[in-house]
Each structure stands twice: as structure tokens, then as C-alpha cells.
């Protein structure tokens, strides 16, 4: 199955990349943009047919490697 993990900074954590993108958009006269947040998306295939096991495995991957859970949140999507 295909796995999509979206990682983003937690609310309240300064997003310097988001601020830079926001500033760049404003300099291009996109003045109607606000609250820009930049994250990352990790996409991979997982050879697992049991959705519950897949979710447990990917959660562990996120907790151990893919996200810094002190400052980042993550969301997991399983696609059959």
C-alpha cells in the first residue's frame, strides 16, 4: 500500500521558511496570502496488507525518524 506522511511544525513554533515564502509572495504582489506554513511530505510504498499493522509501523517510523515530535506534528494517510 502507498503511504503518505505529512509533517508540519506545531502551532506556536516559528516557521521561518513559511515567513520567507510569505514575504516572497507579498513581493510578487500576492497580498491576499496569510499564515503561510511550510512542511514536508514523505511518500513511500509499504508491503503490508494489514491496515492496523501498517498504521502501527508508520506511526513508529514517524516517532523514531520522520518527525521531530517535540516541534512537529504528523498525519498519516494509507492508500490501498
Language model regions located:
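Short Gly/Ser/Thr- and Asp/Glu-enriched loop/turn motifs at secondary-structure junctions
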Residues: 37-41
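Short, conserved charged micro-motifs
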Residues: 12-16, 49-56
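Residue-level signal for pocket-adjacent positions within structured domains
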Residues: 8-9, 28-31, 61, 66
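C-terminal structural segments of small proteins and small subunits
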Residues: 52-80
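Non-catalytic surface loops within mature trypsin-like serine protease
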Residues: 9-11, 48, 80
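A short linear hydrophobic-aromatic micro-motif
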Residues: 29-34, 73
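Short glycine-/aliphatic-rich beta-strand segments at the starts of folded cytosolic domains
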Residues: 1-11, 42-44
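Short amphipathic alpha-helix segments
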Residues: 12-28
Amino acid at each position: 500500500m502507498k503511504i503518505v506522511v505529512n509533517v508540519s511544525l506545531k502551532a506556536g513554533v516559528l516557521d521561518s521558511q513559511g515567513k520567507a515564502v510569505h514575504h516572497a509572495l507579498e513581493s510578487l504582489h500576492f497580498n491576499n496570502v496569510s499564515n503561510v506554513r511550510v512542511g514536508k511530505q514523505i511518500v513511500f510504498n509499504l508491503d503490508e496488507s494489514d491496515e492496523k499493522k501498517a498504521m502501527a509501523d508508520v506511526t513508529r517510523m514517524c516517532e523514531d525518524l520522520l518527525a521531530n515530535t517535540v516541534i512537529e506534528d504528523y498525519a498519516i494517510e494509507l492508500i490501498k
